[in-house]
Amino acid sequence: RYEEPVIKERDAHNRFPATSSVAYKSGFLNRPIVDEYVEILWACMKLLWPGIQRKQHSYRVFLSHDVDRPFFVYDQSWHQIFRNIAGDLTIRKDLSLALQRIKCKVRNDSTLDPANTFDFIMDLSEKYDLKSEFYFMTDHTAGSLDGSEYSIESLQITKLMHRIYERGHRIGLHGSYNSFSNPQQIKKEFERLMKTTEKLGIKQDSWGGRQHYLRFENPITWQSWEDAGLNYDSTLGFADNIGFRCGTCHEFPVFNLETKRVLHLR
């Protein structure tokens, strides 16, 4: 991502926009251009060395979900709920949603919460023999921009995380809004996740996640994740367009442009 430190355009959330990229301007953002170059190189190599063998890769699907707001009702005060109900009735014109909020709060039952779709997502993932990853926030550095200010140590969230793990799915970090350029904050948030999962007996062979709002600064964000002990990052998509921000559909080792060093982070 050499162009990102060089080109200075940023959007309202200080993100490098797809529209400023060479790929978008040249019309190949929706093509994995690096992978296409590899295929051309391989075709040339086969002509020169017909007996050469190539490592075969299998296709895999990785499903990941940012947990910005785990519940709409369960962890809210009546004041917040009535404000949302007013919006349901006057803006969204959805009486059933308003009634569902009241029912969930009165019964104190998170399974009735309209935002509680975790089991639905896991059921659907398992139907197709897939594992889902759920990225939790462990700190909220920007108030409402970070969704609902839930606590990762709360009983409801720890029960949810343990249920995800018991069903064979994965837990990860969703870095808060202001953490992307703050190495100390990323370290703090990941340590909090590790402390909580350790208490719950959650063990994984690797840990990853994604930055909130896809906020990213090269090379600070990647280096911060590496230094904090994370193994992989899935932030590198664009917020304003779909496409291949890194020009590939394969995972790859990260390169720090300042230190000229390949990182362990992928």
Regions found by a protein language model. Give the residues of each.
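Terminal accessory/targeting
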Residues: R1-S151, F238-N241, C246-E251, L257-R266
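Metal-dependent polysaccharide deacetylase catalytic core of the NodB/CE4 family, i.e.
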Residues: R69-V73, K93-S96, Q100, D119-R215
